[in-house]
Amino acid sequence: MKRLQAFKFQLRPGGQQECEMRRFAGACRFVFNRALARQNENHEAGNKYIPYGKMASWLVEWKNATETQWLKDSPSQPLQQSLKDLERAYKNFFRKRAAFPRFKKRGQNDAFRYPQGVKLDQENSRIFLPKLGWMRYRNSRQVTGVVKNVTVSQSCGKWYISIQTESEVSTPVHPSASMVGLDAGVAKLATLSDGTVFEPVNSFQKNQKKLARLQRQLSRKVKFSNNWQKQKRKIQRLHSCIANIRRDYLHKVTTAVSKNHAMIVIEDLKVSNMSKSAAGTVSQPGRNVRAKSGLNRSILDQGWYEMRRQLAYKQLWRGGQVLAVPPAYTSQRCAYCGHTAKENRLSQSKFRCQVCGYTANADVNGARNILAAGHAVLACGEMVQSGRPLKQEPTEMIQATA
């Protein structure tokens, strides 16, 4: 089987190279935005979507135009890749996978991609990029496989390179034969049906006061001044640090779970729906807005979607599988007798069945219900719906996160 893998390193460009990279990223952003604007005009005129083949001719037209001849100074392939990114964004929108494409803003996700023409010298920790030349990078691990494309990106004032490779590997067979249910939560990041518990790292919560202080300082500075730019970079670095802490911890958790279990059953949680604002409208204001806002922050701080993504590809690489089941009533159902009632969940950590008297940790009970749902799905050979797809947190948890 063929495996696609990405290796990300920090670049060490020279002063002139850094200026060129900023210019290339700006050119790619310009091409993307201008093509999107033309697509919008075409749509308003009542015409159909214009595919990539036609958009590529626009690029030739813009390069020959007097006011945009500066596009010739940028490599052609990254500009073409920007148009392909726009085409992919439209396809995702048509398939209802993403929202309608939006214009790119300067300083946010500045990047450009080379599909070919790249040379990698791992022994000397350097890479050759068209129109940029040889550039050093922080070589932290060996790149394996055939290089398919290279993406250069900027984050918090630093430049990074992502090298995507393709390699041929034998079909993996997972060393374990066990199956486990995983219950994701706020008080506990993940609880397994065998009783294993992974505590949350809460990287945002731990840095929330520092972030608020930096944002207050930013509000007192003149917008777009040098001091304002410096303060904004401090906030960006803190956000990056928070995300890195969360991602690193999730990698450790998902690796530990993936190594020990061939089949992992999780809840099919809709995080975007669960973390929607409760503010409501002027005519119909929401209730418990502050408490819901605190719960939303706690949910997003855990990184449930990222944990699911990591589990999926790690299981694929190890020969295992991830199975998503409907999350309805897993926190209210007794894992022993199957009785489902809201009163069974006494608190965040306590579960006691009102019928059979079964007592257990609430998260462990939920994980066992998830495992049982996974067994039912495998037995039936199809997804089993068991009510509305909603995972409820107890009232005391909502209050505690406010």
UniProtKB/Swiss-Prot annotation:
Binding positions (Zn(2+)): 334, 337, 353, 356
GO molecular function: DNA binding; endonuclease activity; metal ion binding
Cystine pairs: none
Record EC number: 3.1.21.-
Keyword Cell division: no
Top EC class of this enzyme: hydrolase
Keyword line: DNA recombination, DNA-binding, Endonuclease, Hydrolase, Metal-binding, Nuclease, Transposable element, Transposition, Zinc
UniProt-listed InterPro entries: Cas12f1-like_TNB, RNA-guided_DNA_endo/Transpos, Transposase, Transposase_put_HTH
Job description of the protein: An RNA-guided dsDNA endonuclease. When guided by an RNA derived from the right-end element of its insertion sequence element (IS), cleaves DNA downstream of the transposon-associated motif (TAM). Cleaves supercoiled and linear DNA in a staggered manner 15-21 bases from the TAM yielding 5'-overhangs. Binds reRNA, an approximately 150 nucleotide base sRNA derived from the 3' end of its own gene, the right end (RE) of the insertion sequence (IS) plus sequence downstream of the IS.
Protein name per UniProt: Putative RNA-guided DNA endonuclease InsQ
Biological source species: Escherichia coli (strain K12)
